[in-house]
Amino acid sequence: MPPTNRPPPFSTILSSASLPSYSSTDELTPIYQGAEAHLYKTTFLSPSQPAALKIRPSKPYRHPILDRRLTRARILQEARCLQKLVKEGVSVPALLGVDWEPSAGDGSSWLVMEWIEGEPVRVILEEWEAYLKGIEREKRLGLGEGVQGSEEEKVRGLMRRIGRAVGGLHRAGVIHGDLTTSNLMLRPLGSADTTETIEERDQSPSMAGEVVMIDFGLAMQSSQDEDRAVDLYVLERAFGSSHPRTERFFEEVLVGYRESYKGAVSALKRLEDVRMRGRKRSMIG
């Protein structure tokens, strides 16, 4: 990772080898490091205000002028999408700050966002599928009654909330570009305690909470049905590949989506065309 300046009000320089240690009031915790961006948990303005710091580093293999233009365009696109969605009342991280031309002059750019507490929907569904597998095993051994209807209804409720969240995104004229269950957070309502006791580890995970979409690095502004349908198709494929036991509930996502805004019907019709093209592509290889 190339040296990257920590933006104001941050002052510590990130080393290419490792991150230096910080005091309890000035902590920078690595969360994710990808090819396009690095994500950290930090604080903003106050030690009690957690925030997410996203840095888009420069690419040394690109021409410096082209690199600065691309990095600037992408960070500004992400910031504009977040700002628009917050204004429209969509559940996304609030934008706290952005700098597309830091004074370091190294070609990097950054933005600071609200820190979203909770778990990714991916983790919740993986825990539920593991719980489901255990229940089915007990039933085969004659030790239980199998999955209760309330469990399936709980999953259906979460799927519908996901659909409504995506519908709100599309109603606002924004396309996510990378809709997966890793980019959907389930934020606890109020001050709910998300810590888990030993007795609760083998229980069905809670699915209560607000669905919050994160990571808008590939987002764009569009009201085209084709773009909306592709967004939905990416999410559908994510369920098929990552959550095989939950895939059968994906129709509930579309139910919630259909209820969320007037233009949903035409986007769902286009989804059928996108699915058809996807199947042909899979057959051809």
From Swiss-Prot:
Signal peptide: none annotated. The keyword Acyltransferase does not apply. Its main location: cytoplasm. This protein is considered an atypical serine/threonine kinase, because it lacks the conventional structural elements necessary for the substrate recognition as well as a lysine residue that in all other serine/threonine kinases participates in the catalytic event. BUD32 has protein kinase activity in vitro, but in the context of the EKC/KEOPS complex, the catalytic subunit KAE1 switches the activity of BUD32 from kinase into ATPase. Gene3D superfamilies: Phosphorylase Kinase, domain 1 (3.30.200.20), Transferase(Phosphotransferase) domain 1 (1.10.510.10). The active site is at 178 (proton acceptor). One of its GO terms (molecular function) is protein serine/threonine kinase activity. It catalyses: L-seryl-[protein] + ATP = O-phospho-L-seryl-[protein] + ADP + H(+); L-threonyl-[protein] + ATP = O-phospho-L-threonyl-[protein] + ADP + H(+). Component of the EKC/KEOPS complex that is required for the formation of a threonylcarbamoyl group on adenosine at position 37 (t(6)A37) in tRNAs that read codons beginning with adenine. The complex is probably involved in the transfer of the threonylcarbamoyl moiety of threonylcarbamoyl-AMP (TC-AMP) to the N6 group of A37. BUD32 has ATPase activity in the context of the EKC/KEOPS complex and likely plays a supporting role to the catalytic subunit KAE1. The EKC/KEOPS complex also promotes both telomere uncapping and telomere elongation. It is found in: Cytoplasm; Nucleus; Chromosome, Telomere. One of its GO terms (cellular component) is chromosome, telomeric region. ATP binds at residues 31-39, 54. Belongs to the protein kinase superfamily. BUD32 family. It comes from Emericella nidulans (strain FGSC A4 / ATCC 38163 / CBS 112.46 / NRRL 194 / M139) (Aspergillus nidulans). This is EKC/KEOPS complex subunit bud32. GO terms for biological process: asexual sporulation resulting in formation of a cellular spore; hyphal growth; tRNA processing; tRNA threonylcarbamoyladenosine metabolic process. Its EC number is 3.6.-.-, 2.7.11.1. Component of the EKC/KEOPS complex composed of at least bud32, cgi121, gon7, kae1 and pcc1; the whole complex dimerizes.
